[in-house]
Amino acid sequence: MTFSTQIKAELVQNKLIDKHWNVFLAGFFQNNLKLLYNRNWSFKVQSEALKEQFVQNLKFDFKTKASKKYFLFEFNADINVINTLLKLDVTTSELVVKQVYLIAAFLSGGSVSDLINSNNFHLQISSNNEFQIQQLLKLFSFFKKTVKQNQLVVYLKSYEKICNFLKLIQAFDGYLAFENKQLEKSFTLNQLRKSNLEVANLMKTIRSNNQTNQLQLKSFIKSSSFAKRPLNFQRYCLIKSDHPDWSLEQIANFFFTKYNIKISRSGIQHFSVNLKKLCQ
């Protein structure tokens, strides 16, 4: 189930729809209704729950057809009755009426980005009705308008504004899921920043220690005690001085290539331990 489907499943169950059915019809029909012929009209719904909502409340004589993607309603109604719905303006109505209209508009043409795979939050309502788009812009002033695929669209990209819209249309479960996703995202980003800072500090420490060790090594090579050490140990010190980042294996390979001497990595490690003791 997508997050859009989850939100719509919650909205369909809102009891306000039954109480303000004509407002709901207006919000839905202003985007979704098509005139077939004479006084015959059609519209589509995509969920079983929304289909049942119309079956229970639609006062017109209707018939339904089911396909794999949607349910098609066809009904007969007087054009004056339909025009009243299509021209309904709720921008100056009480809050509950505005909420029902927005619920219908979202159920008709709304979508929101999925929580799992999306890093950028996006909510939109598409409509082919300029009158409805203008109402949506007034009902929720944070909406911005654009055109996508020959459809008018109002949209939100801000996390806070999407949360506010979900609360306005009483999609409270969706709002909480959205909040939790943002908290997870913020926590992950904070952990990543913290981890990056720790790595950066560690690298600074390592570089500082390496610089100190190199100075101590060069000082030891110049000391009188250096010449008293075994030849291979002296060679190790010189190699380490010239190539401080080499691994044990690289140094062992160099011994074999340069001096034809086989020294195991454990032997090189032994040189390293002795050098650290001498440089302390």
Swiss-Prot record:
DNA-binding region(s) from the entry: 247-279
A Gene Ontology BP annotation from the UniProt entry: cell division
Gene3D superfamilies to which the protein is assigned, alphabetical: Homing endonucleases
Name the UniProt record assigns to this protein: Probable cell division protein WhiA
Domain of life the protein comes from: Bacteria
A Pfam family this chain is assigned to: LAGLIDADG_WhiA
Function: Involved in cell division and chromosome segregation.
Keywords from the UniProt entry: Cell cycle, Cell division, DNA-binding
Keyword hit for DNA-binding: yes
